[in-house]
């Protein structure tokens, strides 16, 4: 939790600087490439982090680098939405991509379970001793990241550079001034800080809550993760359609209301069956919230 929190703070600081620099220089794809490479290396190097106290600091450092790079990847990745969509279908394309991402996450999780977690014998004669099953998952996920990033680098053109003569810092300050002058936009960015932190908390501690309060087994926690991803994928897909019809602001408001309602239900119930239903509802509203947040930024930022 602490690692995720620190990474979130650094993302809030580095994200605007990185975005301004890559936009001004016209190197969004190149920036994304280096971030993916860093994420790949940091995640794959977790293979060497054995369940032993002497590897604790090693695991913390590379886990932190992996998480931070993944967070920053989204900064460059989200900025490419305009290159693969038109103004009239931002919502549909964003929703479809979030849906695909969730399905990809589910697929990666299932493959890890089938290949490394459930079997008694692992591929390539890897031993389960010293956490070989979990460490193998780190290598697999790092390769998964590289493979499914390739279409971006092969088929999407580099966006045109911003022709402003201002340096990166002044360009960034100008962006902040635009935000502060627009009260509605300023309120949104403040709200975004809170609700995105809430989403990070949900993903980080959802499984812990299920384990401690409802006594979920490790297998049930995995099913819980799959359920959340399926419902979020469905919500993102449908939310993209409504985004183009109603606008991202309305979808965001509806999604936040749905998450709050589902969260309250989760806190009040004590039956497992109801927990599953409320969790599905929670995930269903998380998907469109993430998708429409990207669309809104795409529309309001030049």
Region annotations inferred by a language model:
Residues 13-27, 235-248:
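Helix-to-loop junctions at the C-terminal end of transmembrane segments
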Residues 47-62, 267-279:
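Helix-loop junctions at membrane interfaces in 12-TM secondary transporters
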Residues 1, 204-221:
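Short amphipathic helix-loop junctions that connect adjacent transmembrane helices
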Residues 108-121, 142-161:
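C-terminal membrane-cytosol helix-exit motif in multi-pass small-molecule transporters
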Residues 30-45, 250-265:
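Structural signature of the two symmetry-related core transmembrane helices
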Residues 94-116:
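Glycine-rich segments within core transmembrane alpha-helices of 12-TM secondary carriers
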Residues 71-85, 288-302:
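Intracellular juxtamembrane helix-capping segments at the cytosolic ends
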Residues 157-190:
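Juxtamembrane intracellular "pre-TM" segments in multi-pass secondary transporters
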């Amino acid at each position: 939790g602490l690692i995720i929190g620190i990474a979130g703070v650094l993302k809030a600081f580095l994200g605007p600087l990185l975005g301004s620099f890559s936009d001004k220089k016209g190197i969004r794809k190149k920036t994304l490439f280096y971030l993916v490479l860093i994420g790949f290396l940091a995640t794959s190097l977790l293979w060497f982090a054995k369940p032993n106290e002497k590897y604790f600091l090693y695991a913390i450092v590379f886990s932190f680098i992996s998480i931070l790079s993944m967070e920053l990847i989204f900064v460059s990745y989200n900025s490419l939405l305009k290159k693969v969509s038109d103004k009239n279908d931002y919502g549909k394309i964003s929703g479809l991509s979030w849906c695909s991402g969730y399905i990809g996450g589910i697929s990666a999780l299932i493959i890890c379970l089938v290949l490394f977690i459930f079997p008694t014998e692992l591929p390539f004669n890897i031993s389960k001793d010293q956490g070989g099953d979990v460490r193998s998952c780190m290598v697999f996920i790092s390769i998964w990241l590289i493979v499914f990033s390739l279409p971006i680098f092969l088929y999407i053109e580099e966006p045109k550079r911003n022709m402003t003569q201002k340096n990166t810092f002044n360009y960034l300050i100008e962006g902040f001034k635009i935000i502060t002058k627009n009260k509605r936009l300023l309120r949104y960015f403040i709200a975004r800080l809170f609700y995105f932190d809430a989403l990070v908390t949900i993903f980080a501690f959802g499984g812990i809550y299920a384990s401690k309060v409802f006594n979920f087994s490790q297998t049930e926690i995995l099913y819980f993760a799959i359920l959340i991803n399926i419902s979020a994928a469905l919500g993102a897909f449908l939310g993209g359609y409504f985004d183009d019809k109603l606008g991202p602001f309305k979808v965001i408001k509806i999604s936040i209301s749905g998450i709050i309602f589902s969260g309250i239900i989760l806190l009040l119930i004590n039956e497992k069956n109801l927990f599953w239903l409320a969790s599905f509802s929670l995930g269903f509203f998380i998907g469109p919230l993430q998708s429409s947040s990207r669309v809104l930024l795409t529309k309001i930022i030049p």
